[in-house]
Every structure is written in structure tokens, then in C-alpha cells.
Amino acid sequence: KEYTSTLSIDLPHKPGILGKVSTLIGMNDANIINIEMTKRSKDYLQFLFDIQIKDLKNFTNLISQIKQQNLKFKVIRHKKKKYAFIQRVLKNFKRN
């Protein structure tokens, strides 16, 4: 069973950073189903990544790896029951 989540991530203006984040997502067995740039400033770009992910372990690993990159991010919670697993994971992480 796959779950859908949206990650909002602020990426600094650095060559290769979008590729690095996309690779992190893929390495955790998640599929990017949509990317949207929502904000642009001189220092950063804000992207929304809609992802499909197979299980809680992969989601937890992905969030940990994003935190290790020192990126400002948040997970947008979906209100449908099938996304409730994401809410359980978020209780274990401090908000940025």
C-alpha cells in the first residue's frame, strides 16, 4: 500500500541542491509525483514535493536525512485517514 504526502522544502540557491533532495527521496523508496516551486527569493527557492511512499520506515528515514541536510522543511499533513501514519511519524520530530 502506498501513501501520499507533501513536503515543503526551502532550498538555497546552490548548484545541484534540487538533484540532491530528489535523490534522497528516491533512495528512500519514495516516488515524486509532482514538484511545484511556490516561492523565490534571492537566497532560496521553496518547493512542494508530492511524494508516494510505501511505509513508515522509509518515511522516517527520509525525514531524518532531510534534517541532516539542515534544510528548512515541513510536512503538509493530509486529512484523509490513509495519511494518518504521517501524523504518527511527525510526533517524533521537532518542527523546524
Regions found by a protein language model. Name each.
Residues 1-96:
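A conserved regulatory-domain signal marking ACT and ACT-like small-molecule sensing domains
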